[in-house]
A protein has these predicted regions:
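Glycine-rich phosphate/pyrophosphate-binding beta-alpha loops
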Residues: 135-138
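Short beta-strand/strand-turn micro-motif
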Residues: 130-133
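Conserved alpha/beta cores of soluble small-molecule-handling proteins
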Residues: 1-128, 141, 146-157
Length: 158
């Protein structure tokens, strides 16, 4: 059974980037299960109950696990900022994380090889672009056009 995840920031009861999370969830479901009915995360993430019971919950992380049948699991935890001071570069052209699979074994294996570094940057080469992405909060995308490289595209995963 294929399961996927959405990790959503909830700031004092306000669900952040809800439309982006809805789009990614429904795009994933449409790709794997074309006959699936679109879901609305707002039906599951009711604002007054978001993170209820989390001690000192100003910012909460919701973890939504979903699959063919819909939402399989929903959990809340306190949001904690991870401070990253060092990165290990890992080339992994065969890892495909286009869809946020709940099965993170290949990513966890790379993370285990980081040594003394706080996190990793995964480097994937492609004829048009290469992508670097960390396991924490951001994807970093760099496009190659006409022999030059553009840097600075930072895409939040939240």
């Amino acid at each position: 059974m294929c399961l996927f995840i959405e990790t959503i920031r909830i700031d004092h009861g306000r669900v952040c980037n809800l439309s982006r999370h809805n789009r990614r969830l429904n795009d994933t479901r449409a790709h794997f299960w074309p006959e699936s009915t679109p879901l609305q995360l707002s039906d599951y993430l009711s604002s007054p109950g978001c993170g209820a019971g989390i001690t000192g919950a100003g910012i909460v992380k919701a973890r939504v696990v979903y699959g063919e049948k819909g939402i399989e699991d929903l959990s809340y935890s306190p949001y904690a900022v991870r401070h990253v001071h060092s990165l290990a570069l890992m080339q992994a052209d065969t890892i495909d994380y286009t869809y946020k699979s709940a099965g993170r074994e290949p990513l966890n294996c790379l993370f285990a090889l980081r040594g003394a570094c706080d996190d990793i940057l995964i480097v994937k080469h492609h004829p048009i672009y290469f992508i670097l992405h960390t396991l924490s909060e951001f994807n970093i995308i760099s496009n190659k056009r006409n022999g030059s490289t553009e840097y600075g595209h930072l895409v939040s995963l939240n």
